[in-house]
Amino acid sequence: MARAITLVESTRPQHRALAQELLTELLPHSGRARRVGISGVPGVGKSTFIDALGVMLTSLGHRVAVLAVDPSSTRTGGSILGDKTRMERLSLD
């Protein structure tokens, strides 16, 4: 997943054709996903809420993916985080 994201975001000419090929293969499989954005100040309970919501959804038979981004990253403008430690119950499902 990380390699695919890097490839698609790359500005290198040699990556453009590969990124287009990847997106062409994935696009037919992308129509059924629901996307939800959660935002808030640090400490407000975003990870706790996502954990509880995710556990509820997986208990109903749904599949859940979490992509957590920190937009305050000065180097990248939005680093992708690994919040598995904050979403312990969901990481077990």
UniProtKB/Swiss-Prot annotation:
Q: Which SUPFAM superfamilies match?
A: P-loop containing nucleoside triphosphate hydrolases
Q: Which InterPro entries match?
A: GTPase_ArgK, P-loop_NTPase
Any one Pfam family here would be MeaB
Organism name: Streptomyces virginiae
Record-level Gene Ontology MF annotations: GTP binding; GTPase activity
Q: Which domain of life is it from?
A: Bacteria
Please list the disulfide bridges.
Answer: none
Entry GO CC:
cytoplasm
Q: Which family is this protein grouped under?
A: Belongs to the SIMIBI class G3E GTPase family. ArgK/MeaB subfamily.
Q: What is this protein called?
A: Uncharacterized protein in mutB 3'region
